[in-house]
Amino acid sequence: MRPLQALTYFISRTMTITDFTNKHVVLSSDKPFAQAVKDIQAEMGRASTETLGEKLSASKDFGEFAEEMEFLAGRSNFINVALLNWGKVMAKVPIGMKAVLFVIGNPLTARKLLEAGGPEVGLYLPTKISVYEDKEGKTQVAYDQMGPVMAPYNNPQLDAVAAAIDKALANLADKAAN
């Protein structure tokens, strides 16, 4: 492709850029890092995205799948679908740190969010919560609220689902931190 053709191709596309104000929440904890990680894990179910897909395929209908998800979700109503231990990753660099990122969600909540906002809001699913030790050795639990991310859509249904997610995230963070 010649440079002029590339420019023409780019210009013929439409791009929308939307600003939003993120709300990043950090809870300080007196718990040791390992205890906060253990406590947050105790609140969540655990299944990979592959396992969730297999369960959906094997279910006779969405109702049957929903029953399985309610059982799997744990007390927090979240399923831990992936975990990234930044401490282990960075040990190879070597940068010493204690930090675990949990990728969490619930297909039933995702369905509500996607029904209300369409496929574009799927960009924000699943969500994340992190437990880490700061430079002073204090345990922190951090997450980004969903409500501010959904606010630019001006959709009351979307706002309601995002508010429920934010409440569940706050409860989960509180269980890990306190």
Regions inferred by a protein language model and the residue ranges of each:
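Feature detects long, helix-prone N-terminal segments enriched in hydrophobes
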Residues: 2-178
